């Protein structure tokens, strides 16, 4: 899929005083672009999200603060750092192989009951940790769960804390409609049980 020039203009360029070189586009959305980047010293690969600062004020700051608060859990995508680069902000994360949605739809090996249990336990453990730190994701869906590999025994990582909150009780509805709990759909006041 061809991308707009503003998306591809960073390919081959370095950021963070030459520490990271942007190599490929992983995806583009409404507010940002995610690239694969390599650490020029260690050779390690990372996912780097680029956001125009006009869009990164309050919401992106909140997202990164909440993500950083829970990033130490082994099943939460690791957030490494924020890079200020003039007009843009770059957010550096561990690089994963894909998302759970892709695994479920395209791969037959995900029909293994033991694998499903292991994945489910990893997700529940990550959410329990997030809740113990006062962070409520509110947009949990297969696309927001990244995977370590697209075959074999996989590890999963909860990602995308863009709708996360610290409010244990809330009456506002948010999330992806197909994945929202009935309580969210009916706009009743709900607590942390609904705020996965």
Name each region found by the language model.
Residues 1-15, 23:
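Juxta-kinase regulatory segment immediately upstream of eukaryotic protein kinase catalytic domains
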Residues 33:
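Conserved N-lobe ATP-binding subsite of Hanks-type protein kinase domains
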Residues 50-71:
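Conserved N-lobe beta3->alphaC-helix segment of eukaryotic protein kinase catalytic domains
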Residues 119-120:
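Activation segment signature within eukaryotic-like protein kinase domains
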Residues 131-148:
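Catalytic-loop of the protein kinase fold
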